[in-house]
């Protein structure tokens, strides 16, 4: 079934993270309810991130889903504390590193208007025998989180060339992931995070829609 939303109110980041609620009901009486937001965005090389037609500079953090004494078994209250701290520091975007996070936290991103980067746990080292696993995890990530307006990109991997470098098999695996994302979701771009400087003309670097480079720098004294 399909339906148009007329005179829709946009999900507009921190300024107005407006959400709609939709319920699907089957003939047997079963129902499923979800929330979604209406928004459009683009990424321009000169203007940066544009949300609903206006520039929206991104300032953010990366979040791991764990706590001392709790590990990854964190509570909703802990997630809410994380969100409160992120908002208090003035961030408007978040990278959910480097795996599927709890649905409750994606919901919080929608609710409070954080722009989010979601990704799979394909990290540091490429293993050829794990290709099927990476594809399965990416499919689950996209299908489970498609309705979240906060998510604006799918991350293919993180610092994947640290131990293995760029290989033909590595590139092929990322091409499969990239194609899968585009097939499942034509509305969001793909990206990957690089830890080291790579040739910008390398086909591997140019493979996703967005190239993201991590800069690790030590604090330096200032006058």
Regions found by a protein language model. Name each.
Residues 63, 99, 121-123, 157-159, ...:
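Active-site beta-loop-alpha junctions enriched in small/polar residues
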Residues 140-167:
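Active-site groove signature of glycoside hydrolases
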Residues 120-125, 215-218:
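Short, acidic/turn-prone active-site loops that include or flank metal/cofactor-
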Residues 172-218, 222:
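Extracellular glycoside hydrolase catalytic/binding regions
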Residues 124-136:
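Active-site-adjacent "subsite" loops/lids of carbohydrate-active enzymes
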């Amino acid at each position: 079934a399909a339906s148009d939303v007329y005179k829709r109110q946009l999900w507009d980041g921190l300024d107005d993270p407006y959400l709609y609620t939709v319920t699907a009901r089957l003939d047997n009486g079963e129902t499923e309810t979800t929330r979604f937001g209406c928004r459009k965005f683009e990424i321009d090389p000169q203007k940066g991130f544009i949300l609903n037609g206006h520039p929206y500079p991104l300032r953010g953090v990366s979040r791991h889903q764990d706590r001392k004494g709790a590990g990854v078994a964190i509570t909703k209250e802990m997630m809410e504390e994380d969100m409160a701290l992120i908002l208090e520091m003035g961030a408007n975007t978040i990278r959910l590193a480097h795996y599927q996070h709890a649905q409750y936290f994606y919901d919080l991103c929608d609710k409070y208007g954080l722009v989010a980067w979601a990704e799979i746990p394909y990290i540091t080292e490429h293993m050829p025998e794990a290709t099927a696993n990476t594809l399965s995890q990416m499919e689950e990530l996209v299908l489970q989180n498609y309705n979240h307006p906060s998510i604006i990109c799918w991350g293919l991997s993180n610092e994947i060339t640290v131990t293995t470098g760029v290989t033909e098999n590595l590139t092929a695996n990322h091409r499969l992931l990239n194609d899968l994302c585009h097939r499942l979701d034509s509305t969001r771009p793909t990206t990957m995070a690089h830890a080291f400087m790579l040739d910008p003309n390398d086909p591997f670097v140019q493979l996703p829609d967005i190239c993201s480079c991590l800069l690790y720098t030590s604090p330096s004294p200032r006058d």
